[in-house]
Each structure stands twice: as C-alpha cells, then as structure tokens.
Design a protein with these regions (language model features):
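Catalytic phosphate/metal-binding cores of nucleic-acid and nucleotide-processing enzymes, i.e., regions
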Residues: 1-97
Length: 97
C-alpha cells in the first residue's frame, strides 16, 4: 500500500489518501504500507503534523523493531521538510542496525 498524507494536494493515482497523522499511523501499524509520502502542514497543527508520523516511525523502529516503509517528504514548508528529512535519515540509520 502507498499512503499519501496531505490536506490540499490531489492524491496521486494508486495512492491511499489520509488527512491526519493518526490515520497514517493506523495504516502503518498494519504492516501493509510499502511507501508513505508526508506533508507537514495539515491545516490544524493542534491535530498534528507529518512530523508526528516521522516521530512515531522512529520510536516504532527503536522499541519494536518496526520495518519502516520507503518515506518521502513533499511539504512546501522548507524548514519543516528539512527537519522531516533529517528524521527520515535517522530512521534509515536505526533500521539498518
């Protein structure tokens, strides 16, 4: 499954659209997600951001040995995207252990 977390952009063909971090995390917990593409700003920061998904994946890798999917960041928020990409690099490093 390919998961696309975004509140505004059109969903690419063949992707499953979610709007909130908890929806993405629920799908990740199934183990069926092969690729996930994350936006940061989702319209309501009190409801969470794409970075919350990065944090969940990182913790799941460390605590439970979760095998992360391929992770893409497509956020227009450049500083948040940089932070998310740094998180992806950390996840990749941890997953190789």
């Amino acid at each position: 499954m390919r998961v696309f977390l975004d509140d505004e952009r059109p969903t690419p063909e063949g992707w499953h659209r979610v709007y909130w971090p908890e929806e993405a995390i629920q799908l990740l917990e199934t183990g069926a997600v092969e690729e996930i593409s994350l936006d940061h700003d989702l319209g309501d920061d009190t409801h969470g951001t794409g970075y919350d998904v990065i944090l969940w994946i990182e913790e799941a890798v460390v605590v439970r040995g979760f095998k992360p999917p391929h992770i893409c960041v497509h956020s227009a928020n450049s500083s948040a995207a940089d932070k998310m990409r740094a998180g992806v690099q950390t996840i990749q490093r941890l997953a190789r252990r």
